[in-house]
Amino acid sequence: MARVVALVLLGLLSLTGLEAVPRVPKVQVYSRHPAENGKPNFLNCYVSGFHPPEIEIDLLKNGEKMKVDRSDLSFSKDWSFYLLVHTDFTPNGVDEYSCRVQHSTLKDPLIVKWDRDL
């Protein structure tokens, strides 16, 4: 009898409160080194604090997708996820760079522009 009660309680606990809450991604776009026109650099898009883990992240140059590398998907202590997408680039003062994020918590893609002065 005690075994049945324990199994029922375990079943009820598994149904309540364990479902993860969707979380909107936070996006940071930055270069590895201070921007200098004509000098090679690395552009990073760090996306954190999101759940569920399915996400699309693109770096854009003048609105066009760039070839990128990405870190492995990882999670924080609070079970939210984070990911780094990066590529090499050479700023020139004319081209516009941004990061586009698509996630189930967002109605429309989130686009964050790179601010060369940060």
From Swiss-Prot:
Domain Ig-like C1-type: 22-115
Subcellular location: Secreted
Functional summary from the UniProt entry: Component of the class I major histocompatibility complex (MHC). Involved in the presentation of peptide antigens to the immune system.
PANTHER family from the UniProt entry: BETA-2-MICROGLOBULIN (PTHR19944:SF62), MHC CLASS II-RELATED (PTHR19944)
Disulfide bonds: 45-99
GO MF terms, alphabetically ordered: MHC class II protein complex binding; peptide antigen binding
Endpoints of the signal sequence: 1-20
Summary of subunit composition and partner proteins: Heterodimer of an alpha chain and a beta chain. Beta-2-microglobulin is the beta-chain of major histocompatibility complex class I molecules.
Gene Ontology process terms (BP): antigen processing and presentation of exogenous peptide antigen via MHC class II; antigen processing and presentation of peptide antigen via MHC class I; immune response; peptide antigen assembly with MHC class II protein complex; positive regulation of immune response; positive regulation of T cell activation
Chief place of localization: secreted
CDD domains for this protein: IgC1_beta2m (cd05770)
Name listed for the protein in its UniProt record: Beta-2-microglobulin
UniProt KW keywords: Disulfide bond, Immunity, Immunoglobulin domain, MHC I, Secreted, Signal
GO cellular component, one term: extracellular region
Any Pfam family the entry gives: C1-set
Family designation: Belongs to the beta-2-microglobulin family.
